[in-house]
Amino acid sequence: MRLGFHMPLSGGVGKQLNRASELGMECIQIFSGNPTSWKPGKITPKSRDLFIKKQEELQIKPLVFHTPYLINLASPKNDIREKSIYLLNAALEKAKAYDAPYVVTHIGSHVGEGVEKGIDLVSYSLEKIMEDWPEGVELLLENTSGAGSTLGGSLTELKKIIDKFSGTQVLGCCFDTAHAWGAGYDISNVKEVETTLELVNEQLGLDLIKVCHANDTNVPLGSTKDRHQHIGEGNITDEGFGALLTHDSFTPKAVIMETPKNGTDCDQINLQRLKKVVGRHEEE
């Protein structure tokens, strides 16, 4: 597996690559643009070329793009849905420009219209995006904690969407551990991980998971709450993370941490903790 973090855009992506290298990261996730804006980030050929050159030099791969939080492919409001389609299209194009194989997105909320209606609207949105899909980029639908009318708390919801496009092979899943815990998927120890992965394989298919967001959380299991915590400071436990991430279905994945940035050395501490948990502490 390759371990890394979600990194802020401040200072430019080149600066973040250098920071990632200093910390010993092997992959990186960044936003495709301002996470709270409907305006997509611009692609500047010069900065893109410098980034790709630096990425190759440092061997920090893969680069994963995360879409802005505003996207709601399930919105019953046409204007919100159309803006979401536009923003997601821009993220996919940016990923192609930067040689990034994956774009991670939250699919959104049905806003009280019901799960099936929400799934239909997501499928409609993706059909529109499929009309001009950039080659070499895969869209990963992220599971959620299942709060309110948000889609993706149950992996079966993601599977229903992905199955509608089974012939395209451009859709997969990003599995977030904190979100899974909030949605009721217990991954706190070896036994529970084995049971949960059997369920995940049944509901979704382990082969569809291409990226893992490794985040601890201190919310109660099945609470539908979404709060990220530092590795080792929540309810998932070292045993749970170790059993999950060293499972055969997860070892080839890019593992991205989205842990709190509330200290200058918190990323370094989280990285070393996770390395130790998965049996790579000898690299320290």
Curated annotation (Swiss-Prot):
InterPro entries: AP_endonuc_2 (IPR001719), Xyl_isomerase-like_sf (IPR036237), Xyl_isomerase-like_TIM-brl (IPR013022). Binds 3 Zn(2+) ions. GO terms for biological process: base-excision repair. One of its GO terms (molecular function) is zinc ion binding. The keyword Hydrolase applies. Keywords: DNA damage, DNA repair, Endonuclease, Hydrolase, Metal-binding, Nuclease, Zinc. Its EC number is 3.1.21.2. The keyword Coiled coil does not apply. Zn(2+) 1 binds at H66, H106, E142. Its cofactor is Zn(2+). Pfam families: AP_endonuc_2. PANTHER family: APURINIC-APYRIMIDINIC ENDONUCLEASE, ENDONUCLEASE IV ENDODEOXYRIBONUCLEASE IV. Endonuclease IV plays a role in DNA repair. It cleaves phosphodiester bonds at apurinic or apyrimidinic (AP) sites, generating a 3'-hydroxyl group and a 5'-terminal sugar phosphate. Belongs to the AP endonuclease 2 family. This is Probable endonuclease 4. The lineage of its organism: Bacteria, Bacillati, Bacillota, Clostridia, Natranaerobiales. The gene is nfo.
